[in-house]
């Protein structure tokens, strides 16, 4: 079992190795995890090494390598042109303290959960913009309901009157149905993803912005795939 910080560090080291070819320095790790001292990084490194996720190599600078990633939080993104993250699943049934199945979460004391940030969402972005995991987000477990979840970074003001601002991070439960009035991630023509309020307009689907500068857009049902429902957001000040 990993804590959120341990998993964040493991993923940072893994991604740094893939992109740069060498492990990050302790200073880079400290900055990435927003820690104030290297001692916190040393403790996380030691914990990851004890659990068999990384290995320290003697007599070498930046001598850390990733041995393995936790199986339950390895993300396998579909090559299909839609949002299809194989994300962490949370099932809020009661679990015995001795249970080895933690509902596909790596949880510390069942208080925090880690979900993937799957890119950025705007009024209409190419679906490829939200298919790639860019980071992870640590959340209180009671913020998450049944189902699979992921996060997206908002990059426009089309939903501002619904309280969703540019640079907010939204939490989405993956589902393919919605009730009129709910805010959803919609895939249009398998090409374009957008965050809008879901409405019915006769036999058609209306995607409604929460900003008078954006028009409501009407589509035939076969052009729209619902990819998830908004369940919460996080804002940094």
Curated annotation (Swiss-Prot):
Recorded GO terms, molecular function? DNA binding; serine-type endopeptidase activity
Show the Gene3D superfamilies listed in the entry.
Umud Fragment, subunit A, Winged helix-like DNA-binding domain superfamily/Winged helix DNA-binding domain
Family annotation (CDD domains): S24_LexA-like
Q: Which Pfam families match?
A: LexA_DNA_bind, Peptidase_S24
Q: Name the residues annotated as site: Cleavage.
A: 123-124
EC assignment: the record states 3.4.21.88
Positions annotated as active site in the UniProt record: 158, 196
Q: Which InterPro entries match?
A: LexA (IPR006200), LexA-like (IPR039418), LexA/Signal_pep-like_sf (IPR036286), LexA_DNA-bd_dom (IPR006199), LexA_repressor (IPR050077), Peptidase_S24_LexA (IPR006197), Peptidase_S24_S26A/B/C (IPR015927), WH-like_DNA-bd_sf (IPR036388)
Listed under subunit, the entry gives:
Homodimer.
**Family statement drawn from the similarity comment of this UniProt entry:** Belongs to the peptidase S24 family.
Q: Which PANTHER family match?
A: LEXA REPRESSOR, LEXA REPRESSOR-RELATED
User: What name does this protein carry?
Assistant: LexA repressor
Instruction: Give the organism, scientific name.
Output: Bartonella quintana (strain Toulouse) (Rochalimaea quintana)
């Amino acid at each position: 079992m990993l804590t959120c910080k341990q998993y964040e560090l493991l993923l940072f080291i893994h991604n740094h190795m893939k992109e740069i070819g060498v492990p990050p320095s302790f200073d880079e790790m400290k900055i990435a995890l927003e820690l104030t001292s290297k001692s916190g990084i040393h403790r996380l490194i030691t914990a990851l090494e004890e659990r068999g996720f990384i290995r320290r190599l003697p007599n070498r600078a930046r001598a850390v390598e990733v041995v393995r990633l936790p199986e339950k939080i390895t993300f396998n993104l579909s090559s299909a042109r839609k949002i299809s993250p194989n994300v962490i699943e949370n099932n809020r049934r009661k679990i015995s303290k001795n249970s080895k199945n933690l509902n596909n979460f790596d949880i510390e004391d069942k208080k925090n959960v880690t979900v993937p940030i799957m890119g950025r969402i705007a009024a209409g972005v190419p679906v490829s913009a939200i298919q790639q995991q860019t980071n992870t987000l640590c959340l209180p477990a009671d913020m998450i309901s049944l189902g699979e979840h992921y996060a997206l970074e908002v990059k426009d003001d089309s939903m501002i009157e619904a309280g969703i601002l540019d640079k907010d991070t939204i939490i989405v439960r993956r589902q393919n149905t919605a009730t009129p009035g709910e805010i959803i991630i919609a895939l249009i023509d398998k090409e374009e993803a957008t965050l809008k309020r879901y409405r019915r307009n006769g036999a058609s689907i209306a995607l409604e912005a929460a900003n008078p500068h954006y028009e409501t857009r009407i589509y035939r049902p076969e052009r729209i795939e619902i990819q998830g429902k908004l369940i919460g957001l996080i804002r940094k000040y």
